[in-house]
Amino acid sequence: MKEKRFVNDNIKRLLVSEYLRKENDNAGFGGMEMKRTPYGTNITLYVNRPGLVIGRHGTKIKEMTETLEKRFAIESPQIEVKEVNTPDLNPQIASKKIALSLEKGWNYRKAGNTSLRKMIDLNAPGVLIRIGGKISGERARAQKFMFGKIKYSGEPARSGVEYGFSEAKLKTGIIGVSVRILKSNYRLPDDIEIKPVKIEKEVENNGAESKGAEGNE
C-alpha cells in the first residue's frame, strides 16, 4: 500500500512539474519543489523572470493555484516564486536556451560550446550537455559537450547532479537537449582531500642554558 502511494505521489509530482513548466516556459522555468505541510502543499517555483509568473494583479498565479487544486487534487496549494540568481547554472534554463538557439538557426556545436563556456566561466565543477537528433544529415546522432566531473547513476547522481531537458522543434525533426550540472558544494565520494601535515621540529636540549653574569661584591 505504501509503495503504491509512493509511486502515485511521484507520478503526480511529475505531472505537476510538467504543467508548471509549460505554463511558465516564457518566464524561464528553472524547476520546482513541492512539500506537504499541516496547512496544505507548498510549491516553490524557480524562474528567471518572476513577474511573468505572478501576472498582473496576481491573476496568473491565482489561475495556476485553482488548476492545481481542481485538476491535480493538490490540497490547499500555496505557490511561492523565487528568482534564479545565475540562470546559466540552472540546467533547465540552460537547456531551454540551447533549444531556442537551435530553433533560431544556430549550429549545434556553437550552441553547445557557447553554453559550456558560460558555465565554466561561472566555476561549474562538472557539466555534461547532450544534443541529440538529426543535428547533421539524415541520421540521428548525439553530440556531447563535457567539462570536469559528472555522475550518471547512484547516490551522487541523485543528490549531487541537477538535470534539465528541453526540445527544439526544427524542420528536420525534434532535437533533444539535456544538461547535467554538478552542484558546486557537493563532494563526490572519490574526491580525496590531502591536508598538509604540520611537522613540529624537535629542538634537542643538552642541558645548556644561558646564565646571566653574576657580579662580585
Curated annotation (Swiss-Prot):
Entry keyword annotation includes Ribonucleoprotein: yes
GO cellular component: cytosolic small ribosomal subunit
Keyword Methyltransferase found: no
UniProt domain KH type-2: residue ranges: 16-85
GO MF terms, alphabetically ordered: rRNA binding; structural constituent of ribosome
A biological process from GO: translation
Protein name per its UniProtKB record: Small ribosomal subunit protein uS3
Originating organism: Picrophilus torridus (strain ATCC 700027 / DSM 9790 / JCM 10055 / NBRC 100828 / KAW 2/3)
Gene for this chain: rps3
